[in-house]
Amino acid sequence: MTASRRTLMVMAGGTGGHVFPGLAVAHRMEAAGWRVVWLGNPAGMEATLVPKHGIPMEYVRFGGLRGKGLKTKLALPFNLLRACAQSLAALRRVRPDVVLGMGGYITFPAGVMTALSGRPLVLHEQNSIAGLANKVLAKLAKRVLVAFPGALPHAEWTGNPIRAELARTEPPKARYAARSGPLNVLVVGGSLGAAALNEVVPRALALLAPGERPRVVHQAGAKHIDALKANYEAAGFAAGDDVRLVPFIDDMAAAYAAADLVICRSGAMTVSEIAAVGVAALFVPFPYAVDDHQTTNAAFLADAGAAVLVQQRDLSAELLADWLRGQSRASLAAMAERSRSLAKPEATDEVARVCATVAGANLESLQ
């Protein structure tokens, strides 16, 4: 059977942390001549995003229990059986040679039915702490891949699949050496914004003398841009004071590459992207993440001296201002180089090769 006649089913949904790495692998497999079909939730972001990438979809309705009421919990057995039936029907329609599970609630019933139907399952865990579903599915999968070492026992450390442009960024040593003047700081609140960063960073900058202040690009989240502008104005900043406020950033590769320091949360993809580019980071983990996995994600780089980890409860304008005063471009460049050394820039190709191997395909098709 030739690669052009082989089919990969990607099952992923719910958040960008599951969907975007899945898309990276999907496009890599398509480039090698594979047919790709996506299994997702019709209510998830994947239902809108994935078709825009030209990938056909199959749907399974299934959600989590966290934060839900008694009615939803009592309906779990029925909903799980329905999701299993929908998953099996999709598998029979698509007849994939291999199924790649990238996370999200639907991965559990679909992964179980993949194994029960005799089709090979490859599992990828993006976070440093695996959820319950992946801990169960890992026992059923042919190969188990992780973004962070030790996330699952007996797993292969491949890193997180990322966008190709991030892996192609110029090495940090050359980037930092070419700069002079104030430090360039990128503050990333994510698509939803990070209120703690939006409140503390302006006040911290105000505590610095004008000659100590960095140039700042602060991404607020679309719903938070007006509040962020008010925070900077309250801290005494006006438009043009080396501070640029934006609701979102289209080209994150360029934004990371232009920064000496990134101040941000520590979701799995953010940590992986920062390492791939090679840029110094100050991580403030989201304190309500499941199993506090953002702290463990950040610790992967922080424990190696490749980033700094500050818990939100400890973050203050005074602490941040004092820390910024102690940084130089040289110290941040050293941090960036350590970060780059821990990256897995070939993660997308590696995950794709594992899928091909499990399906019995010729690896030459992925060269």
Swiss-Prot record:
Binding sites annotated in the UniProt record for UDP-N-acetyl-alpha-D-glucosamine: T15, G16, G17, N127, R163, S191, I249, Q294
Example GO BP: cell wall organization
UniProt topology in membrane: Peripheral membrane protein
Entry keyword set: Cell cycle, Cell division, Cell inner membrane, Cell membrane, Cell shape, Cell wall biogenesis/degradation, Glycosyltransferase, Membrane, Peptidoglycan synthesis, Transferase
A Pfam family of this chain: Glyco_tran_28_C
InterPro entries: GlcNAc_MurG (IPR006009), Glyco_trans_28_C (IPR007235), GlycoTrans_28_N (IPR004276)
Pathway(s) where this gene product acts: Cell wall biogenesis; peptidoglycan biosynthesis
Domain of life: Bacteria
Molecular-function GO terms, alphabetical: UDP-N-acetyl-D-glucosamine:N-acetylmuramoyl-L-alanyl-D-glutamyl-meso-2,6-diaminopimelyl-D-alanyl-D-alanine-diphosphoundecaprenol 4-beta-N-acetylglucosaminlytransferase activity; undecaprenyldiphospho-muramoylpentapeptide beta-N-acetylglucosaminyltransferase activity
Reactions catalysed: di-trans,octa-cis-undecaprenyl diphospho-N-acetyl-alpha-D-muramoyl-L-alanyl-D-glutamyl-meso-2,6-diaminopimeloyl-D-alanyl-D-alanine + UDP-N-acetyl-alpha-D-glucosamine = di-trans,octa-cis-undecaprenyl diphospho-[N-acetyl-alpha-D-glucosaminyl-(1->4)]-N-acetyl-alpha-D-muramoyl-L-alanyl-D-glutamyl-meso-2,6-diaminopimeloyl-D-alanyl-D-alanine + UDP + H(+)
EC number: 2.4.1.227
Keyword Cell division attributed: yes
Statement: the UniProt record of this protein carries the keyword Kinase: no
GO CC annotations on file: plasma membrane
Major location (coarse): membrane
Protein task: Cell wall formation. Catalyzes the transfer of a GlcNAc subunit on undecaprenyl-pyrophosphoryl-MurNAc-pentapeptide (lipid intermediate I) to form undecaprenyl-pyrophosphoryl-MurNAc-(pentapeptide)GlcNAc (lipid intermediate II).
Family label: Belongs to the glycosyltransferase 28 family. MurG subfamily.
Listed PANTHER family: GLYCOSYLTRANSFERASE, UDP-N-ACETYLGLUCOSAMINE--N-ACETYLMURAMYL-(PENTAPEPTIDE) PYROPHOSPHORYL-UNDECAPRENOL N-ACETYLGLUCOSAMINE TRANSFERASE 1
Full protein name: UDP-N-acetylglucosamine--N-acetylmuramyl-(pentapeptide) pyrophosphoryl-undecaprenol N-acetylglucosamine transferase
Source organism per UniProt: Burkholderia multivorans (strain ATCC 17616 / 249)
